Curated annotation (Swiss-Prot):
Keywords: Hydrolase, Metal-binding, Metalloprotease, Protease, Zinc. Zn(2+) binds at H159, H163, D237. This is ATP-dependent zinc metalloprotease FtsH homolog. Its cofactor is Zn(2+). Residues 339-381 are annotated as: Disordered. Residues 353-366 have a biased composition (Polar residues).
Length: 381
């Protein structure tokens, strides 16, 4: 209703614009002593008509951002009242492990955990179910029905191991939380990094570390199988890395050659009331320089990731073996591999699902009840 009035294209917006005009007139018509307060909400303030936010109309704006760790804890406690949770479930622990979650995401987390518990006839929801629910939300649902050959599993394991090793060793990178070669969503495998806290901003060093990590999966395939046998699994990694590198140059001022200047501007769609004309903000020479700077950033981080993997080929092979054997490894196994120590099985590995359910029931019944870098294959999308 409050969308910005357009440039007259489409022909189907006349009634909507007349409604907006009438609302603006009515809001102007309120006298000062009527005591009428008009409240509205939107998750797209960028498309609002400027007339709506002028003084005398919606002139007070309250931004409701994502909850911090304390807010997430309180939200989780509210939703956890609706399910029977075990005593080992700690809302603060879950809150620390869910940075960037919205209130709806947290509600979904509790619901998914309850569903996992119900599928194995458990009376209470334990931390195991919450971890499974978190993995499903963060990395997508498991596709156990997808059959992968031994060669595909090995290739995916090397790819994900490359991400994990470089992400573990580059400076100021988010810690590696979990690596899996079980197909999830549209990905053949996932390496999930979990931030240690809420991130407000990110430094150039962190961005470059992320670039090295994104290219590490492709590089691992290159080092093991040769350049001619690299798969299409790194397509999404390349897309994300290229966007980061270009934004570093054109928006965030991380290029010494071009300086802290904005070289791109999102003018928006004409159907949202933006101008039909497309302005050119740079010369052809500047555009060429931007491309050169983007390539330079990518090349130096590509080279760094390659050097790290060459220096740690023994860890790459060992992590591949662990992934092929266990399919999913967690922080403890990753730390053991990086320290070149023997690998212990991950939690819950080696027990049939029925035994796991029976064991969980026997433990929870004794207590009183009281909360990615992906390897994608374009041909499977």
């Amino acid at each position: 209703m409050g969308r910005q009035r357009g440039a007259g294209l489409g022909g189907g917006h006349d009634e909507r614009e007349q409604t907006l005009n009438q609302m603006l007139v009515e809001m102007d018509g309120f006298s000062g002593n009527d005591g009428v307060i008009v409240i509205a909400a939107t998750n797209r303030p960028d498309v609002l008509d400027p007339a709506l936010t002028r003084p005398g109309r919606f002139d007070r704006q309250v931004v409701v951002g994502l909850p911090d760790v304390k807010g997430r804890e309180q939200i989780l406690k509210v939703h956890m009242r609706k399910v029977s949770v075990a005593q080992d479930v700690d809302a603060m622990t879950l809150a620390r492990g869910t940075p960037g979650y919205s209130g709806a995401d947290l509600a979904n987390l509790v619901n998914e955990a309850a569903l996992f518990a119900a599928r194995v006839n458990k009376r209470t929801v334990t931390m195991l179910e919450f971890e499974k629910a978190k993995d499903k939300i963060n990395m997508g649902p498991e596709r156990r029905t997808m059959i992968m050959t031994d060669k595909q599993k090995e290739s995916t394991a090397y790819h994900e191991a490359g991400h994990a090793i470089v992400g573990y060793l580059v400076p100021e990178h988010d810690p590696v939380h979990k690596v899996t070669i079980i197909p999830r969503g549209r990905a053949l495998g996932v390496t999930f990094f979990l931030p240690e806290g809420d991130q407000i901003s990110i430094s150039q060093k962190q961005l470059e570390s992320k670039l090295s990590t994104l290219y590490a999966g492709r590089l691992a395939e290159d080092l093991i199988y040769g350049e001619e046998n690299i798969s299409t699994g790194a397509s999404n990694d390349i897309k994300v890395a290229t966007n980061i590198a270009r934004n570093m140059v054109t928006q965030w001022g991380f290029s010494e050659k071009l300086g802290p200047i904005l070289y791109t501007e999102d003018e928006g769609e004409v159907f949202l009331g933006r101008s039909m004309a497309k302005a050119k903000h740079m010369s052809d020479e500047t555009a060429h320089s931007i491309d050169e700077e983007v390539r330079a950033i990518v090349n130096r981080n590509y080279a760094r990731a390659r050097e790290i993997l060459i220096d740690n080929m023994d860890i790459l092979h060992a992590m591949k073996d662990a992934l092929v054997k266990y399919e999913t490894i967690e922080e403890e196994q990753i730390k053991q591999l990086m320290n070149r120590e023997p690998v212990t099985p991950p939690s819950g590995w080696g027990e049939p699902k029925t035994q796991q359910a029976a064991y969980a029931n026997s433990t929870t019944n004794d207590t009183k009840p009281e909360s990615a870098v992906e390897n994608t294959d374009d041909f499977n999308v």
